């Protein structure tokens, strides 16, 4: 008599577990591994995980080690102004050499210049699932992942693209008509990858203009949009959006002005703009604050760059004009923190052996692989958006998916790098006309002193997520909802310890992370 429960009961039990626990179950027996690798189960798990997206943190230690944590995202950030949550540890990598730890797409992390094992001599580029710790894989047909390699300052035909999941993965050359230098990670909205870049005019090298590069992945074509200065791109209700911010002064009081642009018409390039101003006394920051993204609930998220004793993330709702503070506990102290909003745990990628393959080994090391280089894409055409104004702080700019439109977020902070923060979001309303809308908000957080805050993205619910970029305790994540104009601060516990002698450990955070069970391996 077979005592093993039927598949329906096994599914019901496993669907209640996090992806890491499910991945461990696959090691129990071949029978359970076969059940967990079935497409119907992995799709069910992904659907359930998508309904509960998380905040993903990538922490980079001073010794080069990379760690991944995640925490829950508040569902109703406007109900409370301050929260404290604990972070869950997932996996650790031996050495991440690159300055920027990773880029993110659909539950997968791209890591450049890393050593998978402490005994590895070769430095590789790899794609992994941060929940299971497994590397490299593919989705079924019509759910392809691709890696876009943009070479600079080489010629326009030196760019390459790689499709994951094919039997013979190889780099193919791809033509881009515009010589440009990508300077921030990209965002994928409805099969189009958007990223910010500086256009390089060959006859006049010292002259610069700024563009949003639009890459249609199905047709592998580029188009371009001229835009103003953004600090961060977001997905605002399926539209491309951009966020910018600056500090000001009103009646003798220092203010934080946040602007958000939304691309209302892609063809005409028409944008709408939203502005919001906050008073400085509501938030106190002695650190760099950056908009890191927007949640699926349309909240702009502000985060610190480095983890310290107190790590905060702020959620600002532009519609309600509310600001919520979240203290993140558990991140390591003195670490660089990268924050990603709306992370969805996904186990959708299968490969035969764990830690066996790296995507690229020392491939054109002097050139750039753009942020957002791993994308879940179905179409392959592209366009370019131009940014004509000079961007004083391009590193503070983030692309977002704002309600299905490409958006850009810019975060401005005071000289002392404290709250209030001014967040400017620009959304591409009309792609053809390159018309943008702009929204400006000032973010305030009460009685919180945090350093090194950055925008990591926008959640599927429309919250812009900001996090500390180091893992010093306490660790905070901030959810800003442009619609409500609210900022929620969430303290994440469990990410790190107090290490007085260590240098800053960096943290990378990802929004709307979905656990996926299909990224597993066979022995």
UniProtKB/Swiss-Prot annotation:
SS bonds (residue pairs): none
Stated name of the protein: Putative F-box protein At1g30925
Organism, scientific name: Arabidopsis thaliana
F-box domain location: 4-44
Domain of life of the native organism: Eukaryota
Transmembrane segments: none
SUPFAM superfamilies: F-box domain
Matches recorded under Pfam families: F-box, FBA_3
